[in-house]
Amino acid sequence: VYSQYSKISYEPLKTAAYTHTAMVDASITLLAISRNIRIERAKICALFHDYAQFVDNCPHDQHAKLSSLYCSQFLRQTELFKINEIDDICYAISRHSFKNKYDSPLCEALKDADVMARFLENPECELSDIEKQRLFKATADIQK
């Protein structure tokens, strides 16, 4: 993922790709530990969740689905994961933009980590009511 980000020629987009992905990775790691979610799967979700948005500059409403397809292709090529593991990871990535819907524990962790990352990158960013709820719940879970 990061090797592909290094090829982004527009410097602000490259910086955003590195920064946001790293922040989601750190956030989901804490959430996975606190929520007893498999860390490896969580971190893969973090790495790929916005991949298509940064690498292909695709429209926001399509980035989650396209990112999940990239992830599926990558994981299948490694031959290190079972089909159900790949499906679980890719489902979470494909659904992470639907912050107002409740999904699998892995998907919920990714949604919450995405919101946490946005807040940590810019504490003055505008958050919707559901994003605020997610941020408060995520920080409470980490404090447990």
Task: Locate predicted features.
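Short acidic alpha-helix initiation/capping motifs at coil-to-helix transition points
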Residues: 19-23, 63-69
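Short alpha-helical hairpin
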Residues: 1-7
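His-Asp-centered metal-binding catalytic motifs of divalent-metal-dependent phosphohydrolases/nucleases
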Residues: 39-58, 63, 67, 88-97
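Divalent metal-dependent phosphate-bond-processing catalytic cores, especially two-metal-ion Mg2+/Mn2+ enzymes
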Residues: 9-37, 48, 77, 95-144
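Post-HExxH zinc-binding segment in Zn-dependent metallohydrolases
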Residues: 74-81
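A short glycine-/small-residue-rich loop at the edge of a beta-strand within enzyme catalytic domains
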Residues: 15, 19, 55-58, 62, ...
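All-alpha amphipathic helical-bundle segments outside canonical DNA-binding/catalytic cores
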Residues: 83-87
